């Protein structure tokens, strides 16, 4: 085999090994992102809301900085309720990994009737938040803020 071909093959193998160390996104996070894309076409939810305000992204504390951040606070509270919901007791029913069925048509979201009780609850958490984001302004100055300063 040509040495140049071997180098290319080696580079591909090394890059694939490196990619395997990157953890996949929880499936529900992908569904939630797609719901937001339904209500806000052209948006980039995983980038735009991963580190926004006091509540969008991991954790959350203090007073929301704006309406979009309040959507995240409400969503966080809904997920907290889902974790305590009697129908969501299995570890597979975690709101971060639970898969549910929904439809998106013309910017309108519907949680399907074939969801179990836990899936329906989590679907409605995500649906409500996606609709909330669609009605709230996105303020770039609230992205990647100093939470120690602004989230008291």
Swiss-Prot record:
The signal peptide stretch is 1-21
Q: Where does Ca(2+) bind?
A: 55, 57, 59, 76
Gene3D superfamilies assigned to the protein according to its UniProt record, in alphabetical order: Phospholipase A2 domain
Role according to the record: PA2 catalyzes the calcium-dependent hydrolysis of the 2-acyl groups in 3-sn-phosphoglycerides.
Enzyme Commission number: 3.1.1.4
Cellular component aspect of the GO annotation: extracellular region
Record note on cofactor:
Binds 1 Ca(2+) ion per subunit.
What Gene Ontology molecular function terms does this protein carry? calcium ion binding; calcium-dependent phospholipase A2 activity; phospholipid binding; signaling receptor binding
Propeptide part(s) removed at maturation, as residue ranges: 22-27
Instruction: Recite the UniProt keywords alphabetically.
Output: Calcium, Disulfide bond, Hydrolase, Lipid degradation, Lipid metabolism, Metal-binding, Secreted, Signal
Q: Which InterPro entries match?
A: PLipase_A2, PLipase_A2_Asp_AS, PLipase_A2_dom, PLipase_A2_dom_sf, PLipase_A2_His_AS
Record-linked PANTHER family: PHOSPHOLIPASE A2, PHOSPHOLIPASE A2 FAMILY MEMBER
Q: List the disulfide bonds.
A: 38-104, 54-151, 56-72, 71-132, 78-125, 88-118, 111-123
Q: Where is the active site?
A: 75, 126
Tell me its cofactors. Ca(2+)
Q: Under which name does UniProt file this protein?
A: Phospholipase A2 pkP2
Q: Where in the cell is it found?
A: Secreted
Top-rank taxon of the source lineage equals: Eukaryota
Which Pfam families did the record assign? Answer: Phospholip_A2_1
Catalysed conversion reaction? a 1,2-diacyl-sn-glycero-3-phosphocholine + H2O = a 1-acyl-sn-glycero-3-phosphocholine + a fatty acid + H(+)
- Quick one: a GO biological-process term for this protein? positive regulation of fibroblast proliferation
